[in-house]
Amino acid sequence: MNIMKRNLCTFAMIFLLAVGFAVCSLNTAFAQSDPAEETEQSNSREGFSAWEISDELFERMKSGRTYKEDCIVPREDLRCLLVLHKDKDGNTHQGEMVVHKLIAQDVLEIFEKLYDAGYPIERMVLPDNYLADDETMMRDNNSSSFNFRFISHTNKVSKHGLGMAVDINTLYNPYHKFVKNDDGTQTEVIEPATGKPYLDRTQDFDYKIEKGDLCYTLFIEKGFEWGGDWTDRKDFQHFELPTEVTERYSEMYESTSAQKAS
């Protein structure tokens, strides 16, 4: 009987040691896991995610003309955001937006808060659906970010070309500027042209961005600047990173591109 008790005790000790070793091994495995994977899991929320550009999406961007042949922004520096957004009637939609990885997490968090608050965004599809045509896309009130292009008459990449600017509810928050002509006259520029009725910002209408509203506040808190604050022109749909930030990336990409070409 004593022998049986000793054997049972021995077996119990071996079992407990084995379990303890297994638990320690499991804890060690978690401790040594990829931090990025842990962060992704802890920050994940159904309907909101950021992804690297897949082969399928990359082909779509090339055929849709947002990633043009002369694009100097590396594919690996871009992220595709999948988010939920609500229209003015409270209907939920799945949106997608390609941005630079530098702003991906911030923009993802902004869209989460806008969705939770029911802030209306009518449409959010990639510019490739419009063959990267800005006017057509803006008339459709589409919200977007990355669309590669250089600033006119320069070799500088625009902020949308870097994926570091975001346009929201474009039809109802148009771009407006007066351009001086050689003869001293001025030409009024409104983009989209169909956005003219919404230049009067004293009026109340759906999808309007106002200084101090939730969309404005969230972007400003993340360090963006709003085109509605500009004095030489107005771009009510537009949020962008400061020039001192974007120029560093633009110069880096230009330098890398020049080295590859030489």
Predicted regions and their residues:
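Active-site acidic/histidine clusters and adjacent loop/turn architecture
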Residues: 73-138
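Catalytic cores and adjacent binding grooves of peptidoglycan-active enzymes
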Residues: 151-153, 170-262
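Bacterial N-terminal signal peptides that target proteins for export
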Residues: 2-12
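Mid-length scaffold segments of soluble, non-membrane domains
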Residues: 121, 136-171
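Structured segments of extracytoplasmic/periplasmic soluble domains
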Residues: 84-86, 104, 109-120, 149, ...
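Sec-dependent signal peptide cleavage junction
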Residues: 21-36
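N-terminal module-boundary/linker segments of secreted carbohydrate-active enzymes
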Residues: 33-91
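Bacterial N-terminal signal peptides
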Residues: 12-23
